[in-house]
Design a protein with these regions (language model features):
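Metal-dependent de-N-acetylase/amidase catalytic core
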Residues: 1-100
Length: 100
């Protein structure tokens, strides 16, 4: 997917377990973070990894930035005041996590 879409930025979950914020340590979130970071580096920029992708026209690609959500040491904060209602509307669609 990275070689096909060639993103400049990828946003993912942290692969690190957080004991102070247990929701951030859900096994699925940790697995997604690890899989994403492994896909970004070194695989997406290594032309020798998955050589069949070269045959399909998907050249190696270096992602310029990776933002990691729920990390222990956040360094970027986004003001969502203007989209707060949309944020909660989207969150409530995640019915496996929020049932009421």
């Amino acid at each position: 997917m990275i070689r096909k879409e060639k993103p400049d930025l990828i946003i993912t979950q942290s692969p690190r377990r957080r004991y102070d914020r247990i929701f951030a340590s859900h096994p699925d979130h940790l697995a997604v973070g690890e899989a994403t970071l492994s896909a970004v580096y070194p695989d997406s920029q290594n032309p020798h990894a998955f050589p069949h992708l070269l045959d399909e026209g998907h050249d190696a690609h270096t992602v310029k930035a990776v933002w990691i959500a729920a990390d222990e040491f956040p360094d970027t904060f986004v003001d969502i005041t203007d989209v707060f209602d949309q944020k909660f509307e989207a969150l409530f669609k995640h019915t496996s996590q929020i049932s009421n």
